[in-house]
Regions:
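Short alpha-helical
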Residues: 13-14, 41-42, 73
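Structural micro-motif
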Residues: 50-59
């Protein structure tokens, strides 16, 4: 199961769209999801660790995957189960 962390800022105008997208995708794909405010100590630490300089930023399985709001197609591709 994928682990998705969405870094956001309360003042970010695009962040609600990214939040909505990942909440909708949880219906189709099973993944752990967490939203982290970059103005908090936890958010600042994650942003520093992944060199995030803009939000929204999406970390999937510990890897910075998207900066900005991804297209639905790109997000689905990143979340789709990989064949084993």
């Amino acid at each position: 199961m994928a682990n998705v962390v969405l870094l956001y800022s309360p003042s970010c105008s695009a962040c609600p769209s990214a939040k909505r997208l990942f909440k909708e995708l949880r219906v189709k794909y099973s993944f752990n999801y967490r939203e982290v405010d970059i103005t908090t100590p936890d958010g600042q630490e994650l942003a520093d660790r992944h060199s995030v300089r803009a939000v929204p930023a999406t970390i999937i399985n510990g890897r910075l995957t998207f900066i900005g709001v991804p297209s639905r197609q790109s997000a689905e591709k990143a979340l789709a189960p990989r064949p084993t």
